[in-house]
């Protein structure tokens, strides 16, 4: 995602808790930002997505965009904790299924999972 985002943003910072050979190695939920961020754009682990959104809303000056499974928005508990007071401004559902293949693009891959 970072390479594509660099086509549109002057400064892109990338990190992950694992070394994928790109960006820094750090835990987004624990590290203190060294600079203020205009946007936080992420594909968080599903089980941590709510925490990522909470943290992102605190440190982003302009906006937050998350790539999550569509079912993320379907939880009553998540609605009460997250969306009731901070509803998404835009919910952009992918019209086709987007297979997530670790570290590569596989045009023959398929999935039953929807993403937004």
Language-model segments: which ranges?
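Class I S-adenosyl-L-methionine-dependent methyltransferase catalytic core
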Residues: 1-116
């Amino acid at each position: 995602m970072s390479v594509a985002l660099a086509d549109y943003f002057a400064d892109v910072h990338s990190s992950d808790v694992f070394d994928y050979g790109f960006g820094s190695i750090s835990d987004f939920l624990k590290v203190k930002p060294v600079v203020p961020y205009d946007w936080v754009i992420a594909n968080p682990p599903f089980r941590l997505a709510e925490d990522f959104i909470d943290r992102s809303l605190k440190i982003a000056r302009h906006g937050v965009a998350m790539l999550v499974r569509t079912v993320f928005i379907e939880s009553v508990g998540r609605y009460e904790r997250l969306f009731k007071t901070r509803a998404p401004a835009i919910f952009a559902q992918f019209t086709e299924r987007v297979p997530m293949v670790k570290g590569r693009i596989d045009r023959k891959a398929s999935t039953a999972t929807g993403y937004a």
